[in-house]
């Protein structure tokens, strides 16, 4: 380790011990050195004994800074790794960091743009409009048309911090399989690798710009969701320029009610937006926490969502969407056998999984959910229960499904905050059934033919030659098979003759031996010679 890494490691140890997180170390033989080593830091007692473990973990991550805050946020979606009390506390982590100096932001933008800010913008506001761990936002106007915009700029010093902390996380992850009995199954290095990829993706604002453009195109002229326009000509890897929006934060229930917002319709539209993104577009905003969602001031009776911060997105392939939709419908029909079969058919669990055992495990975990009214059943927790059960049957972690589960929990929690009587299943079921019908009905066949038509139009002139080549290959293959069959038959015949000669030879040798013992020497020699000769001929036939 470098001196810098050692200093950072000591800081992490100091923070963890001051919050009493050594309680997380399991009491097993392998961890004895760690538990003994704890006493070497006797000057770092637990200063927060009055708080539960989950809250102490959340506070420790907040104190360690933005990289660890975002890591905790990601871990809050991995409820297979943590008990609910800890996962719930991690979900409360807020990515709020004091802004860095506006003059430094201005300088960094000018470096990225390659010239003075006034070349492209007027009225640049040096005081940040908002700030987070990775970037912060400033307002300005485009010089060319006076359009109000926001400039999102990456923190200049964040990359070295991320790299240093991620290196430490990899080192810590390497200890987990040695310290925890179940550590290997948790695949800690893969968890850190996934987190590192997420962080590095967020550092590239050109990627976020592309995501926002795609989402805006998907919901163009939609009455449900508006995505601000991105000004691509001004975007750089560390600077994003997009339209400034005005709206009510979706978490401000009082303000929404004061302007007469149709809360029931708003909640239902949140669900519809989510399922439209997932099943129609295969491209969904995967960071839909309340800080990234606003509601337009216009038409409160016909409310419109406004989405920002498209740095994290998810996608599902056609097979995943099909199996996910069928899983939901089978679950709410309480067809647990079908749920188990779908997990096997999709490849989410190994093909040799015992379907009966899997069905029973799903039934045991999920049946109690139906003790509640349908309106109170959580889609997110349905997915959580299904995936946690499947992991006991060696289900591989599917990153796209983890993102989907996190987003669904956000959407569901938000919807019920807006309208507590929201029946998510009643809202979603018609959409899912309609989508499934569209995938297997006549429209799906026609659509598939249209998609394949250019390919077959290109290949059609080559078809006679391909058929001829195929017939020739079949003929050659048949000749090879016939030749091989003849060779095998000849070999089997020779082996049969050899076995017969070995048997005759053995009989003659035994008989010759008996005659020799009976003093019939001359006759016995003839039998023995004949036996040896029979063995020799049999051996030659096997060669």
Swiss-Prot record:
List, for all copies, the residue spans of the domain called Protein kinase. Answer: 123-501
HAMAP family in UniProt: UbiB (MF_00414)
What's the protein here called?
Answer: Probable protein kinase UbiB
Q: What family name appears in the similarity comment?
A: Belongs to the ABC1 family. UbiB subfamily.
Q: Where in the cell is it found?
A: Cell inner membrane
Q: Which residues bind ATP?
A: 129-137, 152
For this entry, list what GO says about its biological process.
regulation of ubiquinone biosynthetic process; ubiquinone biosynthetic process
Q: What does this protein do?
A: Is probably a protein kinase regulator of UbiI activity which is involved in aerobic coenzyme Q (ubiquinone) biosynthesis.
Matches recorded under PANTHER family: CHAPERONE-ACTIVITY OF BC1 COMPLEX CABC1 -RELATED, PROTEIN ACTIVITY OF BC1 COMPLEX KINASE 7, CHLOROPLASTIC
């Amino acid at each position: 380790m470098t001196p810098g890494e050692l200093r950072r490691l000591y800081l992490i140890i100091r923070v963890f011990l001051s919050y009493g997180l050594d309680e997380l170390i399991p009491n097993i033989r392998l961890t004895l050195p760690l538990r003994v080593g704890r006493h070497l830091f006797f000057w770092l007692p637990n200063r927060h004994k009055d708080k539960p473990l989950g809250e102490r973990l959340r506070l420790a991550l907040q104190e360690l800074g933005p990289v660890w805050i975002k890591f905790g946020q990601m871990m809050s979606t991995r409820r297979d790794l943590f008990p609910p009390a800890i996962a719930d506390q991690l979900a409360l982590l807020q990515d709020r960091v004091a802004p860095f100096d506006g003059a430094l932001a201005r300088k960094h933008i000018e470096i990225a743009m390659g010239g003075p800010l006034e070349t492209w913008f007027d009225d640049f506001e040096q005081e940040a409009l908002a700030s987070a761990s990775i970037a912060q936002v400033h307002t300005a106007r485009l010089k060319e048309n006076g359009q109000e915009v926001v400039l999102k700029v990456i923190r200049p010093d964040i990359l070295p911090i991320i790299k240093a902390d991620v290196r430490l996380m990899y080192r810590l992850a390497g200890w987990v399989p040695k310290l925890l009995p179940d550590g290997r199954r948790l695949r800690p290095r893969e968890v850190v690798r996934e987190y590192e990829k997420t962080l590095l993706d967020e550092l590239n604002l050109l990627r976020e710009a592309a995501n926002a453009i795609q989402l805006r195109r998907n919901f163009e002229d939609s009455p449900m969701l508006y995505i601000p326009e991105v000004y691509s000509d001004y975007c750089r890897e560390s600077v994003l320029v997009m339209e400034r929006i005005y709206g009510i934060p979706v978490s401000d229930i009082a303000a929404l009610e004061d302007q007469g917002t149709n809360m029931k319709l708003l909640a239902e539209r949140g669900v519809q937006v989510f399922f439209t993104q997932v099943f129609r577009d295969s491209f969904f905003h995967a960071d839909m926490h309340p800080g990234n969602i606003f509601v337009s001031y216009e038409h409160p009776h016909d409310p419109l969502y406004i989405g920002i911060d498209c740095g994290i997105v998810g996608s599902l392939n056609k097979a995943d969407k099909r199996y996910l939709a069928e899983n939901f419908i089978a679950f709410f029909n309480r067809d647990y056998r079908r749920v188990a079969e779908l997990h096997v058919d999709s490849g989410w669990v190994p093909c040799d999984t015992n379907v009966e055992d899997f069905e029973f495990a799903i039934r045991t975990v999920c049946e109690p959910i139906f003790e509640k009214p349908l309106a109170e059943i959580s889609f997110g927790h349905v997915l959580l229960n299904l995936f946690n059960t499947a992991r006991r049957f060696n289900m591989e972690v599917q990153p796209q499904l983890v993102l989907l589960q996190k987003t669904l929990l956000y959407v569901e929690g938000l919807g019920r905050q807006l309208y507590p009587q929201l029946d998510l299943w009643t809202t979603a079921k018609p959409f899912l059934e309609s989508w499934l019908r569209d995938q297997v009905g006549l429209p799906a066949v026609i659509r598939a033919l249209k998609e394949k038509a250019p390919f077959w139009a290109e290949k059609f002139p080559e078809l006679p030659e391909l058929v001829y080549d195929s017939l020739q290959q079949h003929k050659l293959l048949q000749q090879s098979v016939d030749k091989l069959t003849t060779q095998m038959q000849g070999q089997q015949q020779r082996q049969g003759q050899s076995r017969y000669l070995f048997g005759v030879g053995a009989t003659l040798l035994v008989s010759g031996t008996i005659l020799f013992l009976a003093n019939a020497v001359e006759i016995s020699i003839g039998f023995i010679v004949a036996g040896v000769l029979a063995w020799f001929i049999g051996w030659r036939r096997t060669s």
